[in-house]
Amino acid sequence: MTVQLSDEAYAVVEGRHADPFRYLGAHPEDGGTMVRVLLPDAVAVEVIGDNGDVAPLDQAHPAGLFVGPLPGASPRYTLRARFGDTTVELQDPYRFPPILSDFDLYLLGEGTDQRLYDKLGAHPMELEGVAGVGFVVLAPNARRVSVVGDFNFWNPLRHQMRVRGSGYWELFVPGARAGDHYKFDLAGPNGEQLPQKADPLAFAAELRPKTASIVVDATTLPRPRPAPENINALSAPMSIYEVHLGSWRRKEGDQWLTYRELAEQLPAYVRDMGFTHVEFLPVSEHPFDGSWGYQPTGLYAPTSRFGSPEDFCALVDACHAAGIGVILDWVPGHFPDDPHGLGNFDGTALYEHANPMQGRHLDWGTLIYNYGRTEVVNFLTANALFWLERYGIDGLRVDAVASMLYLDYSRPAGGWIPNKFGGRENIEAIDFIRRFNTEVYGKFPHSTTAAEESTAWPQVSRPIEFGGLGFGYKWNMGWMHDTLNYISKDPIHRKYHHGQILFGLHYAFSENFILPLSHDEVVHGKRSILGRMPGDEWQRFANLRAYYAFMFGHPGKKLLFMGSEFGQEREWSHDRSLDWHLLEYPKYSGIQALLRDLNKLYRSLPALHQLDCDPFGFEWLITEDANRNLFAWMRKGNDTRARCLVIVNFSPNVYQDYRVRVPFPGRWREVFNSDSAGYGGTNVGNGGEVRTLEGLVPELSLTIPPLAAIFLTPED
């Protein structure tokens, strides 16, 4: 049978048709129904009608185009194809109805689909009684998009997709299933072949260096149990253990622990240490280990380094079972330019800005999201909701917020483009951040968000309706820089830097602050936290004990990076385990015991956490004793007698009969002393309790241990 091919037929055969459904499949023709099938490498094809009748199709083009009449009146049919010596029966993807409804297209076009991940990506489903996978991807400027994978020999002609709405390409692939590997094969605006792309909405990906996406049936994922109620409240204790999953601990052969192995070990350790939360460095899929996850290519996929999405669910569930909240580092500020990723996705700057003065980070060599694009904002906002809904995550810490807020962030003069008012503020990014926080708290009111924001941008953690950005918390980067600078000085010089301890309290309640000693402070030549401590060996460890006690007595929630809790000597390395063997030595196990007791005290004393973010919870008592490097303040809870006196001595001297006024007469209990012998100290202190002196004003006469902090509470 000789078939005269149309231009449309050639467009399909050559892989440049935007809607192959217009040509392929069953179509009325000359009073009957013609079936057109494109099956590359097939040597013969038959069509089987719904009534069981079989008719051969003629090969109309050597690329694998077969054409012939459909037997019977029903539009349903099956194909039988021979590939060499193998004959298979298969369904024609071009006989099935669309995946996206008109309402789906409306929400996607409007950018308000909060469950974007239920529509885009790869979803196992059943259409007209046939099992398969529905694939949907955004590529508005592509000339042609195909899905390629294990189900079609990675041949881009086999499953060419159709475009609908404002650039959403879709196709139901019969016979594809969960576990299949796939990518999208695109022709750009001018018909040029683009690098094959991983699915931006994939729920799983291959282990690097491979880059294919993996079909996951998200409906079968177990739901982690919820975290303890109100674990993120401003009045609740929040002590966060920050963890890089690949280097917390390793097994024999220097191999990563899997999510399930981590689930058996990490939550128990975090609970034993008294932390309330664990914060994972980004778990979204990323190609380069050395980025620590901060250059993600798969925002919707837990990295395959440690297992499957089901395995990640098990880790979250184990944390919640141990009473631990789970926070994820989330990276909506930039992404890498790996060929299989989001960059130049459809042959144009789809997710990023086209102009490198807006679209590329000079520091990191990464691309910047275009927050002025409706589809991009929808993609990012839905991703935040995805982690909270699908995996039961309790909070998101947003990375590098300052780089999002300022158009001139780390750019030279003349190397950036002002906003429409001529200013440096990124108006679209600000709108996105506010929308993100609105959506998160609207859908998950007991969750939280935290901003890593290093500038003086006002009201980061204040309500949007009052002009704020809407975050729950802000990392206090100023406190971290000032206090680490102070503690790194030899005690003899600290009196000249006394203000670095005092200054943070001038703004301590302008935001809801988290005090971070994060991964960023123990890498790139900064040394470990212990490595910053001056003096001989005893002084180094005493300084560290005093500094940690100072941190836990200071207003604000707490965050400590793994390894710091036992005084790791060396800088953190992402490609090896923490130095757990150090705990064989008392000076390191003493630091660990100190952190465990500080966490316990912080959680048990309302005065230390109830008004963490409220100026009524803090009162300076001694600020001007610079010559002694000594500070004292009162922490307060809601109850009148919920009080905790904190005294920190950053000098190596012991001070006898040191007088401090207190609000209540009677006995005050020394509930914590960082100079305890159990922590490696000298056991100088007040014997566990002290009574106020006789007089009109209650006053304590105290013995202040060297390079140490003591906490005292009034007896009931």
Curated annotation (Swiss-Prot):
It holds the Pfam family Alpha-amylase. It comes from the Bacteria. It catalyses: Transfers a segment of a (1->4)-alpha-D-glucan chain to a primary hydroxy group in a similar glucan chain. Keywords: Carbohydrate metabolism, Glycogen biosynthesis, Glycogen metabolism, Glycosyltransferase, Transferase. Its EC number is 2.4.1.18. Coiled coil: none annotated. The active site is at D399 (nucleophile), E452 (proton donor). Monomer. GO terms for biological process: glycogen biosynthetic process. InterPro entries: A-amylase/branching_C, Branching_enzy, GlgB, GlgB_N, GlgB_N_E_set_prok, Glyco_hydro_13_cat_dom, Glyco_hydro_13_N, Glyco_hydro_b. HAMAP family: GlgB (MF_00685). One of its GO terms (cellular component) is cytosol. The keyword Glycosyltransferase applies. One of its GO terms (molecular function) is 1,4-alpha-glucan branching enzyme activity. Catalyzes the formation of the alpha-1,6-glucosidic linkages in glycogen by scission of a 1,4-alpha-linked oligosaccharide from growing alpha-1,4-glucan chains and the subsequent attachment of the oligosaccharide to the alpha-1,6 position. Belongs to the glycosyl hydrolase 13 family. GlgB subfamily. Pathway: Glycan biosynthesis; glycogen biosynthesis. This is 1,4-alpha-glucan branching enzyme GlgB.
